[in-house]
Amino acid sequence: MLQLKFIWPVARITPIYRPFTSHPFRNLATSSSISSTKAKTTKTDTTPLKLSNELYAIFKIHNRPYLVTEGDRVILPFKLKQAEVGDILNMTDVTTLGSRNYKLVGHPINTSLYTLKATVVGKTKRAFQTREVTKRRNRRVRHAKSKGDLTILRISELSMN
């Protein structure tokens, strides 16, 4: 007769619960240790970026990165409910600012170093799409129709302060 022996697991996996934010997940152990000790802030020299006339920025909306320059058009695959057409948005979740030869990286970068403004050009919908949904071993075909929301932004200002 075969006997089964129960073995206790060596490591237990506990789920991590967190609210939805546009910021990446930060480990609580490292963030509390940083806040308990005095954090040294270093003054970065941003004059090469200030003198550059070709700047780019990577900003995040709903944790999706978008790489833009001044005058670009950004198509967001969702509807921004708070913004109306013609509104000017200040982008604050910028992770990278750079030019052809220099780059400033932070998560996120301090908003006093830059100005990134976008104008809401339009709110529209995608083209009407129909896809066939079937199940195995079943002749029935269901047609799923979708028409997703889009928000179109124009980057109106990108500069270093």
UniProtKB/Swiss-Prot annotation:
GO molecular function terms attached to this record: structural constituent of ribosome
Transit peptide location: 1-35
GO biological process: mitochondrial translation
Chain ranges passing through the membrane: none
Keyword Mitochondrion annotated: yes
One Gene Ontology cellular component annotation held by this UniProt entry: mitochondrion
Keyword Ribosomal protein attributed: yes
Subcellular location(s) of the protein: Mitochondrion
UniProt KW keywords: Mitochondrion, Ribonucleoprotein, Ribosomal protein, Transit peptide
Principal location: mitochondrion
Description of how the protein assembles with itself and partners: Component of the mitochondrial large ribosomal subunit (mt-LSU). Mature yeast 74S mitochondrial ribosomes consist of a small (37S) and a large (54S) subunit. The 37S small subunit contains a 15S ribosomal RNA (15S mt-rRNA) and 34 different proteins. The 54S large subunit contains a 21S rRNA (21S mt-rRNA) and 46 different proteins.
Known function: Component of the mitochondrial ribosome (mitoribosome), a dedicated translation machinery responsible for the synthesis of mitochondrial genome-encoded proteins, including at least some of the essential transmembrane subunits of the mitochondrial respiratory chain. The mitoribosomes are attached to the mitochondrial inner membrane and translation products are cotranslationally integrated into the membrane.
Family: Belongs to the bacterial ribosomal protein bL21 family.
Protein name: Large ribosomal subunit protein bL21m
Species of the source: Saccharomyces cerevisiae (strain ATCC 204508 / S288c) (Baker's yeast)
Gene: MRPL49
